[in-house]
Structure formats: C-alpha cells, structure tokens
UniProtKB/Swiss-Prot annotation:
<feature type="binding site">
    <location>
        <begin position="111"/>
        <end position="112"/>
    </location>
    <ligand>
        <name>NAD(+)</name>
    </ligand>
</feature>
<comment type="subunit">
    <text>Monomer.</text>
</comment>
<feature type="site" description="Plays an important role in discriminating NADH against NADPH">
    <location>
        <position position="75"/>
    </location>
</feature>
<keyword id="KW-0443">Lipid metabolism</keyword>
<feature type="binding site">
    <location>
        <begin position="74"/>
        <end position="75"/>
    </location>
    <ligand>
        <name>NAD(+)</name>
    </ligand>
</feature>
<comment type="similarity">
    <text>Belongs to the TER reductase family.</text>
</comment>
<dbReference type="GO" id="GO:0050343">
    <property type="term" value="F:trans-2-enoyl-CoA reductase (NADH) activity"/>
</dbReference>
<feature type="binding site">
    <location>
        <begin position="273"/>
        <end position="275"/>
    </location>
    <ligand>
        <name>NAD(+)</name>
    </ligand>
</feature>
<feature type="binding site">
    <location>
        <begin position="139"/>
        <end position="140"/>
    </location>
    <ligand>
        <name>NAD(+)</name>
    </ligand>
</feature>
<feature type="active site" description="Proton donor">
    <location>
        <position position="235"/>
    </location>
</feature>
<keyword id="KW-0275">Fatty acid biosynthesis</keyword>
<keyword id="KW-0444">Lipid biosynthesis</keyword>
<dbReference type="GO" id="GO:0006633">
    <property type="term" value="P:fatty acid biosynthetic process"/>
</dbReference>
<dbReference type="InterPro" id="IPR050048">
    <property type="entry name" value="FabV-like_NADH_b"/>
</dbReference>
<keyword id="KW-0520">NAD</keyword>
<feature type="binding site">
    <location>
        <begin position="48"/>
        <end position="53"/>
    </location>
    <ligand>
        <name>NAD(+)</name>
    </ligand>
</feature>
<dbReference type="GO" id="GO:0051287">
    <property type="term" value="F:NAD binding"/>
</dbReference>
Length: 400
C-alpha cells in the first residue's frame, strides 16, 4: 500500500516502515561517525527500547560500544492492511541492522510493567548473556496496569494548585492560542507518580538483582526532564514533576544497592526533544520550537542520538575511566546546554512576542512539525513515499 501521514491530535495514526528504518540508519550513521566508545558496557538491557531516548540508547550501546542488547517495549505490529506503530518498525530495523553487523540483538514485545516481562527478560539474559552490565530504563507510558490487581492507572499532565494559562501553539491548526489546564486532584497526582515515578524501575532492578543477572559494577540509568521556569508550572511543578522527583528517590535507593558491588544508579536529565510524549504536554511544542532555533544558531542543538552518545562517552563511560560529573542530587545533567542563561533569556524575551503571523519566522516551528512527522517515518530524506510498501514486517520478537 501507499502510506500517507494522518494526524489526529498528538499522534500520527499512520506510520511508514521504510521511513522508520531510514531514521534508525541515520542514528546508526551518526554513532559510527563519532567513533567507538572506549569503556562501553558489553551486555545492555534497555527497557523502553523502541523510540526516542530508549532507541538511541540501544543504538549507542550496540553501534558505539559493540554491545549485545536486549530491548523491551510494547508495540503493535503491522498487517498487510494497516501499518503498525513506529516503535515496532524502529525495533525491527534495529534488530536487522545490528545482526547484519554480527551484533547480538533480541527483543521482547509486551507490557514492561508486568511481572511476566521481567521474568521473560531474566530467562533470556540467563540463557544468552549470563548477566548484563547496564540497564537503561526509558519507559514513557500514560497508563500502567498494576501487575498484582490488573487495575489500570492513568497519569495526568496537569499543574498543581491552580489553573495554568499560557501562550501555546495548536499544532493541528498552526495557530497561537491561550491554553488553560485545570489543576490535578490529589488522586491524579498520586496516580501520575504510580505510572511515571520510580517504582517500576526499582521493581526491574530488584528482580534482575534477585535473579543474579546483574554483573558486578552494573550501572543503571533512568531518564528525566526538568526544564526551566517557562515550563515548570505544567512540568516540574506539576503532577509530572512529582513523578520525576520519585525517580530521584528511587535512584538514591538503587545507587546504594548497586554501589555495594561497584555499580551505580543515576537519573539522567536530558534536554527537550520532539517526541510523542513531549508533543502531548501543553506549551512544550512552542517552547521546543523557540529553544531549538536558538540552540541551532549557537551550534549546541542536539537530538536524541547526539544527547545519548554524549551521555555514554562523556558521562557514564569516559575514556579516562573517571567518574561522571553529577549535580547535587547525583543526577547526570545533559540539559546543560539548553539551560545556558543566554539561551533561556532569549526564550523568556521571545515568548510574549510570538503571534500566529510570526510563529514560523521567529521559531523553528516548521522544523518542529517536520521532526514530529519524522517520528512516524514521514518526510525522511531519500525515501520514496509514492512507492508501494508492505506494512507487515517479519520479526522474531519474543511475545510477552
């Protein structure tokens, strides 16, 4: 079939398998061009490995460090009549390309929050790798099914205390609007922490540790975003921020646990990027369009792959073997360039000036839209979108 983009709200309901593969190839090419990561781990588990920072982590480990990788994710495969999710095609492409280079790559597809996912992953590690040297936790899900009760808990992207009103962009109509978001209830805050906090990360590490599949010196990292006062009301000071603070709590507990055998646990604070997750957060698309333009002008813009390569090579696995620089909460900070005072001051001054008329001129909004479509495999250079493609892609993913 010939597949065209169809947008509904914050998601594109169609995906292009060839475009998704081209995206993965692009990230691999970048990683190889940077050269090998000297002290990289050799056996890596990535939970949430099919898109965004998780996918880039798997690419950095495999193509930057020569690692054997296991990926866990929850994606829908395509049929001959209907495309699957972008993450499905990303993961399929990664496996194919890794194996072509003689790298071990296996994936498990299903609910990473479940006990079954943890058990099947442990079984696979025991069978194929023995142990792992690194665990990346990169889940971004709006819903968590509680393993013991089957209850579905949902997160809320809302402020705390009072209604938040701000200039935002309606990405469907490309117009500037006033967006208002009602505050979260106590219940919604609690639920957001349950879904997006550190509990499941702890459950994963504890299960892996109890099963004896964490190697001595194993490092684990989970991803977070803090941002600046421009986004704090909806993000860091909102329900989502409470969940991210819980991630810090979990990191502290896990760091003590893994530290006993020479390992470590850190939260890595990353910069804002165009992802399905960030596009759903009010205000983020406009902020991203502004900050990207300034960062590009300053020569410090990074996408997922650049960020993660820098995290591996300049933080966690430095060439000289020295310890990573961390902030006062023991976090790895990769948002350092985005938070530069000149860049933030530019955004603060620009924010009130943005109108529908000057949006495309004063910000990288056009590029934002292009990057958003790229997430789903559209608008990728060198892909023939008039060509007939088969959305049913063969994989040997292990079903959870």
């Amino acid at each position: 079939m010939i597949i065209k983009p169809r947008i509904r709200g914050f998601i594109c309901t169609t995906t292009h398998p060839v475009g998704c593969e081209a995206n993965v190839k692009e990230q691999i090419a970048y990683t190889k061009a940077q050269g090998p990561i000297k002290n990289a781990p050799k056996r890596v588990l990535v939970v949430g490995a099919s898109s965004g920072y998780g996918l880039s982590s798997r690419i950095a480990a495999a193509f930057g460090g020569g690692a054997s990788t296991i990926g866990v994710f929850f994606e829908k495969e395509g049929t001959e009549k209907k495309p699957g999710t972008a993450g499905f095609y990303n993961a399929a492409a990664f496996e194919k390309l890794a194996r072509e280079e003689g790298l071990y790559a296996k994936s498990l597809n299903g609910d990473a929050f479940s006990n079954e996912a943890k058990q099947k992953t442990i079984d696979l590690i025991k069978e194929d790798l023995g142990q792992v040297d690194m665990v990346v936790y990169s889940l971004a899900s709006p819903v968590r099914k509680m393993p013991e009760t089957g209850e579905l808990i949902r997160s809320a992207l809302k402020p705390i205390g009072e209604t938040y009103t701000s200039t935002a962009v309606d990405t469907n109509k490309d117009v500037i609007i006033e967006a208002s978001v009602e505050p979260a209830t106590e219940e919604e805050i609690k639920d957001t922490v349950t879904v997006m906090g550190g509990e499941d990360w702890e459950l994963w590490i504890n299960a892996l540790s109890d099963a004896g599949v964490l190697a001595e010196g194993c490092k684990t990292v989970a991803y977070s975003y803090i941002g600046t006062e421009l986004t704090w009301p909806i993000y860091w000071d909102g329900a989502l921020g409470k969940a991210k603070m819980d991630l810090d709590r979990a990191a502290k507990a896990l760091n003590e646990k893994l530290g006993a055998t020479g390992g470590s646990a850190n939260v890595a604070v990353l910069k804002s990027v165009v992802t399905q997750a960030s596009s759903a957060i009010p205000v983020m698309p406009l902020y991203i369009a502004m900050v990207f333009k300034k960062m590009r002008e300053e020569g410090v813009h990074e996408g997922c792959m650049e960020q993660i390569y820098r995290m591996f090579s300049q933080r966690l696995y430095k060439e000289d073997g020295s310890a990573a620089e961390v902030d006062d909460m023991n976090r790895l900070r990769l948002d350092d360039w985005e938070l530069r005072e000149d860049i933030q001051q530019h955004c603060r001054e620009l924010w009130p000036q943005i109108t529908t008329e000057n949006l495309k001129e004063l910000t990288d909004y056009v590029e934002y839209k292009e990057e958003f479509l790229k997430l789903f495999g559209f608008g990728v250079e060198g892909v023939d979108y008039e060509a007939d493609v088969n959305p049913a892609v063969e994989t040997d993913f292990i079903q959870i």
